[in-house]
A protein has these predicted regions:
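Intrinsically disordered, low-complexity linkers and terminal tails enriched in Ser/Thr/Pro/Gly
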Residues: 1-183
Length: 183
């Protein structure tokens, strides 16, 4: 926030929200933190005919999220991006992840946010096999990275996923496990 005598408060959002002057009380919650969701695994070159397919039968790239916390997390307004300068590139609809739940989002470029039935989530971008930035951002303004592969993730291999093992170390997986624990 910026403060100006007699002029109220203006936040630092891209389109500023101006609040009228008057009496204000600002309370910070010391228990507040970022949501407990991370990018757990992704596959940037899904070419094997036995690989995970979307609802159209396509072998698209995919990103797996995992809620490692003890409470459900609503992803509404959170975002995935392949460009650190555009943290809100693809914004989630209201989708809640229960504790220890996984969510697979296809990185197909189709930009689909309708869930239910056979509909799956699809980002507005696909993943580069040569390595690029990949980030998950909170819904607040300004956006803060909840998890990211920065400055870039390493070069990817056909049908090998990349992500966190049970010890939280980053590595390749010859047997991808979308929607399940990594081995």
């Amino acid at each position: 926030f910026t403060w100006a005598d007699g002029n109220g408060i203006t936040d630092l959002a891209a389109v500023p929200n101006v609040f009228a002057g008057g009496s204000w009380i600002n309370i910070l919650d010391p228990a507040y933190g970022l949501p407990t969701v991370r990018i757990n695994e992704f596959l940037a070159s899904n070419v094997n005919t036995n690989g995970l397919r979307d609802e159209f039968g396509n072998l698209d790239d995919w990103i797996e999220l995992y809620n490692y916390g003890a409470n459900p997390v609503d992803l509404n307004g959170c975002a995935l991006t392949d460009d650190a300068s555009v943290p809100g590139k693809w914004v989630f609809p209201s989708v809640t992840l229960a504790p220890n739940q996984y969510l697979v989002v296809f990185a197909s470029g189709l930009d689909r946010k309708i869930v239910g039935g056979t509909n799956k989530l699809h980002t507005s971008f696909s993943l580069s096999t040569g390595g690029e930035y990949l980030g998950l951002y909170n819904a607040e303004s300004p956006r803060v990275a909840m998890d990211e592969f920065a400055p870039t993730y390493p070069e990817q291999r056909d049908d090998y996923s990349y992500g966190r093992d049970p010890a939280n170390a980053l590595r390749y997986f010859s047997v991808p496990t979308p929607g399940a624990a990594n081995g």
